[in-house]
Swiss-Prot record:
The modification Phosphotyrosine is found at Y196. Essential for sperm motility and male fertility but is not required for the completion of spermatogenesis. AMP binds at A215, K216, K220, G239, G313, E344. One of its GO terms (molecular function) is phosphoglycerate kinase activity. (2R)-3-phosphoglycerate binds at V23, D24, F25, N26, Q38, R39, S62, H63, G65, R66, L122, R123, H170, R171. ADP binds at G214, G238, F343. The modification N6-acetyllysine is found at K11, K48, K75, K86, K97, K131, K146, K199, K267, K291. Disruption phenotype: Mice display greatly reduced ATP levels in sperm, severely impaired sperm motility and are infertile. No alteration in testis histology, sperm counts, or sperm ultrastructure seen. Mg(2+) binds at A215, D219, D375. Its main location: cytoplasm. This is Phosphoglycerate kinase 2. It catalyses: (2R)-3-phosphoglycerate + ATP = (2R)-3-phospho-glyceroyl phosphate + ADP.
Length: 417
């Protein structure tokens, strides 16, 4: 799947066309008020481009939360998003109380020129995800004939399909793979994601460094194996480092995370790294806590001293910070997935914060730096570095699957150039 070969919005003739666009308006809400409008703002360039280039209408569809196929307008309606869009675009936005069916089809068939229409939450229908729950909470699967009808109804709402929701591209849902129109293009947000990930996965600049953190080795096996075929260096930190250090150095790790299942793969991973000439770097010293708690007593440890019984490693220490900085300084391309300490707590945030500072410095020296979404993106938000790295991904799960070498159904479904 060549990411760089997919049809993009700027290559589509939109004049007089109705555009149906999958966006990611899954925004945090409190009492029906939007608490962070970042995802709505991120979709504006694609919407504006359509209107500026003569599109007849832009019909927007999204999910919000996990209603599991049950209509819950009191809790998960997209209506507040319509109001937010109005103020961001300074244009009227028509909100429809459903996303499919005769009334929706009629409203979208021949709207006024330049109309912006927002559909109600796609996940109020079990046919969007293909599975959900009934009113008693029992898991159910959607009837295939009804899924087909749902997709056919969505397909009637536009002449051109645009997907600008990278965050759901790893899901084969009706709105990501089931809209059947002759032209299916990526929006600008999706294009930026695909451009950056193709830089890393198709023709990487070298030296190429992957920084992998997180808790369990077994959750990252596929990621580690795939990246070992691409990178020159790999920093392994976070909770999963303790499984490696116990297996490889027989280090005493106290009550630190140990992943029994992941431990069985360590030897195979190291053999692959050696065969591919990849240098893997582990922490050599640690900041420890006497419990998993923000107010834990804080201690220090090294590989030689080990971590005492009952204590756990929650961050890397000053020596490791220095080593990480030296590796980062050599790289021309960096992909970072997963923090290397419990960054939410100040006592155990130094390792991740120091690494972030080095990655920012590398970016200003011309290194391309890509932050996989999820927790690492949260680190960027916490320390205000979103604009100081090359790219912060908007999709945690989607970016992880790409880096694991998987094909994303929502990208696969787009037209080729």
């Amino acid at each position: 799947m060549a990411l760089s070969a997919k049809l993009t919005l700027d290559k589509v003739d939109l004049k007089g066309k109705r555009v149906i666009m999958r966006v990611d308006f899954n925004v945090p809400m409190k009492n029906n008020q939007i608490t962070n409008n970042q995802r709505i703002k991120a979709a504006i360039p694609s919407i504006k481009h359509c209107l500026d280039n003569g599109a007849k209408s832009v019909v927007l569809m999204s999910h919000l939360g996990r209603p599991d196929g049950i209509p819950m307008p009191d809790k998960y309606s997209l209506e507040p998003v319509a109001d937010e869009l109005k103020s961001l675009l300074n244009k009227d936005v028509i909100f429809l109380k459903d996303c499919v069916g005769p009334e929706v089809e009629q409203a979208c068939a021949n709207p006024d020129n330049g109309s912006i229409i927002l559909l109600e939450n796609l996940r109020f229908h079990v046919e969007e995800e293909g599975k959900g729950k009934d009113s008693s909470g029992k898991k159910i699967s959607a009837d295939p004939a009804k899924v087909e009808a749902f997709q056919a109804s969505l397909s009637k709402l536009g002449d051109v399909y645009v997907n600008d929701a990278f965050g759901t591209a790893h899901r084969a849902h009706s709105s990501t793979v089931g809209v059947n129109l002759p032209q299916k293009a990526s929006g600008f947000l999706m294009k930026k994601e695909l451009d950056y990930f193709s830089k890393a996965l198709e023709k990487p600049e070298r030296p190429f460094l992957a920084i992998l953190g997180g808790a369990k080795v077994k959750d990252k096996i596929q990621l580690i194996k795939n990246m070992l075929d691409k990178v020159n260096f790999m920093i392994i930190g976070g909770g999963m480092a303790y499984t490696f250090l116990k297996e490889l150095k027989n280090m005493q790790i106290g009550a630190s995370l140990f992943d029994e299942e992941g431990a069985t793969i360590v030897k195979e991973i190291m053999e692959k790294a050696e065969k591919n000439g990849v240098k893997i770097v582990f922490p050599v010293d640690f900041v420890t806590g006497d419990k998993f708690d923000e107010n834990a007593k804080v201690g220090q440890a090294t590989i030689e001293s080990g971590i005492p019984s009952g204590w756990m490693g929650l961050d890397c220490g000053p020596e490791s910070i220095k080593i990480n900085a030296q590796i980062v300084a050599q790289a021309k391309l960096i992909v970072w997935n997963g923090p290397i300490g419990v960054f939410e707590w100040d006592a155990f945030a130094k390792g991740t914060k120091a690494l972030m500072d080095e990655v920012v410095k590398a970016t200003s020296n011309g290194c391309v730096t890509i932050i996989g979404g999820g927790d690492t993106a949260t680190c960027c938000a916490k320390w205000g570095t979103e604009d100081k790295v090359s790219h912060v991904s908007t999709g945690g799960g989607a970016s992880l699957e790409l880096l694991e070498g998987k094909i994303l159904p929502g990208v696969e479904a787009l037209s080729n150039m």
